[in-house]
Amino acid sequence: MGAVFVKICGITTEDDALLAVAMGANALGFVFAPSKRQIAPPRAADIAKRIPSEILTFGVFRNESPDRVVKIVNRSGLSGAQLHGHESAEETIWVADRVPRIIKAFAGGSAQAARANEWKSNPILLDAPAPGSGEVFDWTMAAQVPDGLRVVLAGGLRAANVAAAIQQVRPWGVDVSSGVEKAPGRKDVTSVKNFIANARAAWGELEDLPAPAPTPAVDPASLTSEEAPYDWRDSES
């Protein structure tokens, strides 16, 4: 069954990057979109150089021009791009053809998430409508994602709820930012350690459980409009 994929996002310092790696993270995220956790590409490149090659490094963008996304990822030596805005399927595919890896983020409960396979991103990231807000969305909405896509679950995850999230959603991976911080952009050692440990333990327990019962189809009327805003907010906590 393998191990759950764990991504620690919002990395702003080398110390936090090395901490996450030491605790067992599989991937790191550097936020280039406007945010309290925003980092300059040259600084992210410097940190990425000090990270073991087996650890994936993603640049997180929101509504950035595809050409600029490709240039920043490749010039910074990152493993891939995470597109966290209103990027179209065409834009996402264009970027995916020019960077090593791609992750497209969708808001849980959105109409786009229900047809996420059109973006040709696998895995995809399923987040709260307000990324970085620390808010948890209705996890039952994960059932709307088309079969065959690997889901990285995000949105308000922390050490205290990641096990429940994994047990309910059974995602391929989990992503956390504000849930393991002591201040915006600065990670907390204990929180990072406990988050990863709890995620690994919960994933291990899934091997002993029967497959979940089929989830009823999501009523399209319950999905948010394609034009609904996908706002980028930051948790104050």
For every predicted segment, state its role.
Residues 1-237:
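Conserved N-terminal beta1-alpha1 strand-loop-helix module at the mouth
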